[in-house]
């Protein structure tokens, strides 16, 4: 903030003459700078010593001196920003860049993307919103979920290629023949980000803390107890077999922070700064797996860069756009794909909404062209034809005599594309004689709300990261949505069905059984996917190793920058 104040004071001196020499009194300068005459003399002396201006004072009170400017405020701002970056004061850079959006883009562009700063490879990512605090357990946003995966590790992790769980903090695990005991053998060289050695007791304590969270308690409902059975072994004892257990432990929600310090983990990057304007990660020198090739990653929270009239959509998960303005055409898409995650509609059958009426709503959505004509941005979404590849949406020939109810209520939460979807659905159902009342829950999930209790229809977003089949099982088991979709007996039956699926040791059998559960939900017109997202990552030449992850981000440990040319 001190740099910004000095720059503002310099601009106040400069502005009356637009940089031309001035003949002025100290009193006038003090009034202009909103300070005392003594203080303005100090400002003039410091600015002259820094080479910004020349001040020739005249002796005697009220005498006019000569003020000549040597640098423009713009060049001074750029020099200050360069100096702040070289000294690791990124916060000062963002404060100095408080300009109108168009100027902000021009000013920040040279600092974005891949940079070698003091011989340190650093990647700076402009981001369109502040990141929410990292809390234990489930997190609502993709950015936060991805960030948690960079800072924290779990006993297991998902393999990037197979999407199956493999060792992480535990190098191996063994399961008893009855599936009721799981031994996880810990690596012997684990360290927390603060340099402390990781002990089995640390992990045990953090696991017990996670199980105090209602959603995690539901996720690990089959766990009877967890014990440290050896200084290098954690053992899970189960009520019933759960062959998703290694998957559950690999999920970001089960990653383990230090029991005393919730933002200290063991992941490839440690968190060194977390503010509303800047998030900085630095590589963990004692990481137990392959070390990152980048030394630092920074999120610069700059919403004005993403104003629609500047041609940059904030809906893209990551958009790395760097270089000078004349180099922007060199930025190209380096990775893209269709999300496995989807926006969905659930329908609660009741005396107000019958099975065939619910099927008619779904048929209207998928067969009327509604999804294909949503005005949500070019190439942003694609209409869903399946829940997952091969889990296709059923189609029905709805009898003509089936009429929709006179009124229905829809509750939905973010993302913003569902605003458009809700309005289009309202207009489409009105043409069928059904008045749709719309209620918006301004959040990314169904936590902390009971609005669903009054809804016939509910829309939301189901993020899918790694292991999509397991992620959908976790969704049915833990999301607070489902107790509002089903009555109590039906919800209890769903949970007992999931219990029956999890005891199957064979993965293919488990997948097929889970597919049958979701196929029945779609056949019963309880659930239908609406659309998937196009994920894109754009980067300039020189930012290498950028690979799209299932969450629409890229793996920070794989990205790298070539050494700068001499």
UniProtKB/Swiss-Prot annotation:
Disulfide bonds: none annotated. One of its GO terms (biological process) is peptide transport. It comes from Escherichia coli (strain K12). Gene3D superfamilies: Periplasmic binding protein-like II (3.40.190.10). SUPFAM superfamilies: Periplasmic binding protein-like II. This is Uncharacterized protein YbaE. GO terms for molecular function: peptide transmembrane transporter activity. PANTHER family: ABC TRANSPORTER PERIPLASMIC BINDING PROTEIN, PERIPLASMIC BINDING COMPONENT OF ABC TRANSPORTER. It comes from the Bacteria.
